[in-house]
């Protein structure tokens, strides 16, 4: 039989034989002409699944897809008419349909373009530093002196009319160019404030041009005012004291009433607790008598539980198989337009091609750690297996209450299984849960046994370091001893 060529490479004899048998299965399935049937292959390696897909491509009326996870992934063959069309065609995500044209978005202006588009000096939403008005680089001294009267003409200063506050001789734009005028205004305002009388000394007699004559006896008037203020202050103090005494008496009465009520409640609670203690004592006596009966019944129940556990394990295995099949059925129907289908298994014996699949012999150095508190961390589990850490023991989490213990060799795993641990339990991974098995089989590095570090000495270490640094290791070569000359 001639070897087939795939992707420019000739297949091996075993793969060539496998492809020919798959072709025979597909020919037989196609001759049945039943659209409601699908052909299900057993779990095989990824390489063999790839060969099945490539073989199915040669049949125009058939389609193939894979279901399942990890080492349980399987290939399904169905008729092309009942296959759900994939979204990888021309109308897929790479090429959007014309019915959904892209929305046009106008050009985005930058901050400088937006400022130039609007009117100069107009605020946009929030305060922006506007562009300074054009100013001459040099202003003669004469023109700078002419700016003085503008600053002096401020309304409210030296009795000038507010209407004539702004000078008509220099019409300037109000902007950053009026810095000098603002400084002049500030100076004039401070001068006027310094000239004005201090408000703290307003009561002192001052003489001015338009001032009236001061009172003849200002000291007498001040004395009368202070006397009136003192009398009113004393009266207010007396009234406040009377009010405070009345409030204190009311508060004292309320506190006495509250204390009396609390004491009565405490006495009632003590009486209730005494009665409850008597009832508890009576109930404890009854429970002690009942516990004796329960102990005898518990021994009988333990014997029955052992039998029930064995039956439950068998039921769990059957439920797991049924659950796997139902999940596969859901995945298969999700890829088909026909929901009522019949699954047909192949007649091909794939036992000769499943040598590459992981089996129980590859999991002998792995154990499942279970039945421990969710609060335990990796450090706690490593501390429990501290005697195996030096040999290369590792832990891989599955969930909060399950983990995989990876030992360097099957002998170490058997040694750990023979021990009892107080805070957790362990068992071989082959007897573990489905999630733990999938976790281990999905990561091939778990299936590899860790190699022990080879024994080295100082000479080997120096040679390795020198080679890594690119240095030439000086080795003393022993020179051959010259032959001794015999005396004649």
From Swiss-Prot:
GO molecular function: nucleic acid binding
Ranges annotated as biased composition (Acidic residues): 252-265, 302-319
Coiled-coil region(s): 244-321
A UniProt-annotated Pfam family: R3H
Composition-biased stretches (Low complexity): 114-125
Domain (R3H) ranges: 16-81
The keyword Glycoprotein is annotated on this UniProt entry: no
TM stretches of this protein: none
Modified residues (Phosphoserine): 232
Region (Disordered): 87-180, 195-322
Residue stretches of biased makeup (Basic and acidic residues): 266-280, 287-301
Keywords from the named record: Coiled coil, Phosphoprotein
PANTHER family: GROWTH INHIBITION AND DIFFERENTIATION RELATED PROTEIN 88 (PTHR21678), R3H AND COILED-COIL DOMAIN-CONTAINING PROTEIN 1 (PTHR21678:SF6)
Protein name: R3H and coiled-coil domain-containing protein 1
Lineage: Eukaryota, Metazoa, Chordata, Craniata, Vertebrata
Gene coding for it: R3hcc1
């Amino acid at each position: 039989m001639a070897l087939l060529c795939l992707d420019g490479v000739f297949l091996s004899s075993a793969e060539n034989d496998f492809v020919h048998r798959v072709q025979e299965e597909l020919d037989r399935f196609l001759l049945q002409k039943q659209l409601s049937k699908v052909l299900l292959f057993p779990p095989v390696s990824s390489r063999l699944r790839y060969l099945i897909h490539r073989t199915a491509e040669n049949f125009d009326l058939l389609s193939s897809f894979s279901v399942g996870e990890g080492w349980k992934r399987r290939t399904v063959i169905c008729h092309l008419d009942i296959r759900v069309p994939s979204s990888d065609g021309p109308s897929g995500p790479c090429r959007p349909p014309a019915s959904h044209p892209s929305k046009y978005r106008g050009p985005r202006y930058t901050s400088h373009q937006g400022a130039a588009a609007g009117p100069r000096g107009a605020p946009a939403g929030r305060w922006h530093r506007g562009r300074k008005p054009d100013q001459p680089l040099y202003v003669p001294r004469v023109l700078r002196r002419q700016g003085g009267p503008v600053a002096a003409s401020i309304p409210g200063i030296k009795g000038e009319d507010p209407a004539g506050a702004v000078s008509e001789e220099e019409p300037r734009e109000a902007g950053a160019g009026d810095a000098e005028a603002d400084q002049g205004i500030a100076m004039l305002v401070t001068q006027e404030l310094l000239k004005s009388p201090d408000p703290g000394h307003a009561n002192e007699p001052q003489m001015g041009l338009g001032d009236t004559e001061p009172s003849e006896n200002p000291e007498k008037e001040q004395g009368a005012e202070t006397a009136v203020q003192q009398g009113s202050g004393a009266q207010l103090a007396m009234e406040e004291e009377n009010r405070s005494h009345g409030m204190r008496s009311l508060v004292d009465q309320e506190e006495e009433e509250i204390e009396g009520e609390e004491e009565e409640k405490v006495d009632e609670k003590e009486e209730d607790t005494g009665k409850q203690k008597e009832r508890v004592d009576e109930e404890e006596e009854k429970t002690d008598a009942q516990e004796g009966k329960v102990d005898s019944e518990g021994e009988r129940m333990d014997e029955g539980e052992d039998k029930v556990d064995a039956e439950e394990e068998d039921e769990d295995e059957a439920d797991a198989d049924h659950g796997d099949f139902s999940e596969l059925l859901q995945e298969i129907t999700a890829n088909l337009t026909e929901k009522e289908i019949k699954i047909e298994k192949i007649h091909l014996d794939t036992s000769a091609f499943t040598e590459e699949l992981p089996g129980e012999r590859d999991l002998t150095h792995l154990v499942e750690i279970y039945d421990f508190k969710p609060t335990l961390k990796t450090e706690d589990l490593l501390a429990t297996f501290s005697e195996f850490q030096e040999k290369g023991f590792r832990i891989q989490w599955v969930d909060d209450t399950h983990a995989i213990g990876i030992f360097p060799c099957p002998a170490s795993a058997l040694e750990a299984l023979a021990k009892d641990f107080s805070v957790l339990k362990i068992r071989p991974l082959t007897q573990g849960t489905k999630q733990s098995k999938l976790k281990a089989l999905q990561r091939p590095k778990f299936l590899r046994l860790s190699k022990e570090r080879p024994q080295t000495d100082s000479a080997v270490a120096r040679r390795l370091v020198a080679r890594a640094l690119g240095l030439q290791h000086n080795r003393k070569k022993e020179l051959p001893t010259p032959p001794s000359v015999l005396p004649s």
